[in-house]
Regions:
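Mid-domain alpha/beta scaffold segments of enzyme catalytic cores
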Residues: 1-190
Length: 190
């Protein structure tokens, strides 16, 4: 099996490094940009970006979903912000699951309204994620970032129309199960 090294990425599907060269990856914007700089932020020419509410942020004191939504609305006016995310559900870290699910539903709504695909963060919550996907029936593409699950879970997600993005740690059988045009590579670099 020949799996490309992450260090040799031609295109990084998911990174947090703001110094990523334009056209070489999708930079996931941080909460400071979304909450405080959205109205003045300008993308690099030729850059690709994503903006969303990470499930970990739901544990922040004074978490304000409406403030995040206002910031996202401003950022999504830029065509370079081509994805909603990273957003999702994390059973190990973040606010209460009910809050995370409410935020996720709002992010799906935002994605659908803006016509942007979603980058999904999901940790030990694929049952909830699949239920949300079934209930909300999104038309926009969902890509699970940093996928580490097995081939069976990979196939379930693929059958629902989702793509998978693989980082440094992954299950080789899941990689093999995923068609080349439905799998992405990422660094998830800070």
């Amino acid at each position: 099996m020949n799996i490309p090294e992450i260090a040799l990425l031609d295109f990084d599907f998911h990174t947090h490094r703001t110094d990523t060269l334009p056209g070489k990856g999708i930079v996931c914007l941080g909460k400071e940009t979304i909450l405080h700089d959205a109205s003045t932020w300008l993308p690099q020419k030729g850059g690709y970006y994503a903006a969303g509410v990470h499930p970990w942020w739901t544990a922040d004191a004074g978490f304000d979903l409406e403030a995040y939504c206002r910031g996202m609305e401003a950022l999504l006016q830029h065509p370079e912000v081509g994805q909603a995310g990273e957003c999702g559900i994390d059973r190990l870290r973040g606010g209460a699951l009910e809050l995370q699910q409410r935020v996720m539903a709002k992010m799906v709504e935002t994605s659908e309204t803006a016509g942007r695909p979603m980058t999904i963060h999901c940790v030990k919550a694929f049952d909830l994620l699949l239920k949300i996907h079934k209930d909300l029936k999104p038309k926009q593409k969902w890509t699970i970032h940093g996928f580490r699950g097995n081939a069976t879970l990979a196939q379930q997600l693929l059958d629902r129309g989702m793509d998978l993005s693989f980082g440094k740690h992954f299950n080789p059988e899941a990689w093999d199960t995923t068609p080349p045009d439905r799998r992405h590579r990422e660094s998830d670099a800070e």
